[in-house]
């Protein structure tokens, strides 16, 4: 935040009337919401009044809620913040007062005021989600059904009075990274069929529907996917030391490690397959590879336990000569975007 302000001052000095036009700060969940009182604090240090700084903040910040789970709806104890960040604590109390004043002015019911309160009296804590919702210019979920949930349930009181603040922005990927860069062979095939405009106009890929029954195109597509799978297997052999031979079905689960994301369920399924193969219950089984890629939050000990558990299952399976010709497990090391490009291609 300090760097953003310094860069602005380099262009405009201490005239902050253009600040909101030139800067936009995205809050992904509530972890970075401290940027709101921090911006106000920095602007106040520069001589901007609290109300003017709050007005700027309301134009600069936008808030994305990714999940309604408590881990994404942080609360910070007032006693703790007063001890370690006294200025930030005072600014949050001021924002809470501003919110209460607006709620009275706009006729919020007592229930609505309680639901949107920044200072939660019963918990003696600040709600970072309600701070973001009050200040943010725009609020969005990351899928249509999720956006409806936050409007209907999570932030219903704010939505009832300020529906214009709420939008849906469906999570997605860019075709330039995840298709053109990650899979140049498939990009070349697509270019041959529909031209190159899909790089800038995503909807152009819809023209591929005309080729879903074209045997020649489908054959080339299968060849490309086979080539990319072979490239991935060779990369895994080089990076992980796990040799994968022959035609195998690839089951990949690559995402942040969390209990609700069901990696543990996949691990149970893998273990069940292993013991069924050992017992001779699966006579007609296509050789398969189960690939995991994930990281956990530093303090999420249960997630770390799941990672350890999955790796132990993989060690068991890959070391068994009875099954490792038909079933292989891989937990990739240092899973990142570059690795993901190879997996999804």
Model-derived features with residue positions:
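A conserved ligand/cofactor-binding region detector
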Residues: 1-345
């Amino acid at each position: 935040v300090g760097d953003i302000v310094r860069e602005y001052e380099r262009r405009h000095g201490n005239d902050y009337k253009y600040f909101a036009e030139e800067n936009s700060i995205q809050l992904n969940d509530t972890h970075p919401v401290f940027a709101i009182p921090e911006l106000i604090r920095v602007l106040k240090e520069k001589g901007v009044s609290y109300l003017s700084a709050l007005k700027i903040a309301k134009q600069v910040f936008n808030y994305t809620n990714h999940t309604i789970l408590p881990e994404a709806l942080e609360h910070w104890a007032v006693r703790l913040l007063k001890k370690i960040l006294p200025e930030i604590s005072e600014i949050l109390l001021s924002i809470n007062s501003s919110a209460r004043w607006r709620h009275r002015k706009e006729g919020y019911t007592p229930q609505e005021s309680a639901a949107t309160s920044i200072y939660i009296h019963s918990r003696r804590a600040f709600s970072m989600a309600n701070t973001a919702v009050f200040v943010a210019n725009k609020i969005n979920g990351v899928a249509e059904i999720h956006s409806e949930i936050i409007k209907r349930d999570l932030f219903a009181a704010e939505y009832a009075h300020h529906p214009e603040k709420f939008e849906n922005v469906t999570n997605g990927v860019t075709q330039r990274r995840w298709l053109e860069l990650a899979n140049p062979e498939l990009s070349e095939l697509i270019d041959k069929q529909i031209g190159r405009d899909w790089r800038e106009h995503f909807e152009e890929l819809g023209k591929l529907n005309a080729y879903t029954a074209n045997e020649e195109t489908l054959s080339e597509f299968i060849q490309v996917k086979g080539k990319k799978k072979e490239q991935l297997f060779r990369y895994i052999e080089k990076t992980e030391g796990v040799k994968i031979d022959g035609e195998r079905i690839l089951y990949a689960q690559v995402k942040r490690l969390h209990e609700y994301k069901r990696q543990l369920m996949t691990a149970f399924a893998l273990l069940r397959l292993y013991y069924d193969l050992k017992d001779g219950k699966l006579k007609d089984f296509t050789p398969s590879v189960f690939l995991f890629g994930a990281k956990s939050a530093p303090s999420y000990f249960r997630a770390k336990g799941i990672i350890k558990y999955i790796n132990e299952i993989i060690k068991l399976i890959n070391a068994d000569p009875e099954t490792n010709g038909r079933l292989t497990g891989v937990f990739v090391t240092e899973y990142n975007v570059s690795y993901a490009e190879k997996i999804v291609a």
